[in-house]
Amino acid sequence: MWRDTPGAMWRDTPGVRWRLAAPRPVDDPALFLTRLRAEAQGAPVALGLDLPLGVPRAYAARRPEAGFLPFLDTIRAWPDFFRVCAAVPEIHPERPFYPARGIKGMTRAAHAAALGFAGAGDLSRLCDRATPERPAGAPLFWTLGANQSGKAAIAAWRDMLLPALARERSLVRLWPFEGRFRALLAPGTVTLAETYPAEASRHLGLRLRGSKRRQSDRAAAAPALLAAMARLNVAPEPALVLAVTDGLGSDAAGEDRFDCLLGVLCVINVLEGHRPDGTPDDPWLTSWEGWVLGQTAVPETVARSGRRPAR
């Protein structure tokens, strides 16, 4: 979850390449990336975000922009883009998020039809779809349910990403739209990449028994998490070891802290060269849809749009 982030810092120490701090809340989202760059003292910052970075190709096919990055510039002038629709008649391309609350007759098929899509499957990006290794993620524009990601995208894009891009565009880089992940890392910059906890746990060889919403089940995963850190030459701070052993807290934010930890380990896993830092060979991914960092499994069923994106 982008609102809580564990800090990882590279260290050239024998047997230790990374030191990992416990997750902490983000204070001012608009200045979050600036603060990370300041704390890095000129070193490159790599940041994994558990939320969508990109839009589905069925939506993108109707846009005049060349890709997701210029699209972000466009929506800055759309006052209602982030206002979630309460009813289907309110849905249109400049106000695509739905629904504001659960109501009778609410379906993803109706949502898709209101956006001019052929079916509910068009709401999903390729990386949202189920693979042989994990279940499907939720579509970007859908905002209801425990598994939805729309509200996180709204908060992060509106309150963190757009302000940062407006203030310091040359210092903020988005993967995979601007290149391979490791190649984007440069002194004084911050590079953002989408991560997905269900994907990251498989990259790290973790098999959570039970539910990550339960503290006891998260605590039971502590030995595997600490072992994954050791394999990656990560030295967790004592406070983090205690938190992981305790299941990352008894409050509702414990699940978010758990996902944060998976996300930062996913990023380190890629930086260490254990997972690829690119995408499958599909121009939609690097222009509009984005991809999940480190993912190699590709869904068998792919929704095809009517035109190819601009290269």
Protein language model regions, located:
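RNase H-like (RuvC/DEDD) metal-dependent nuclease/polynucleotide-processing core
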Residues: 1-10, 15-46, 51-311
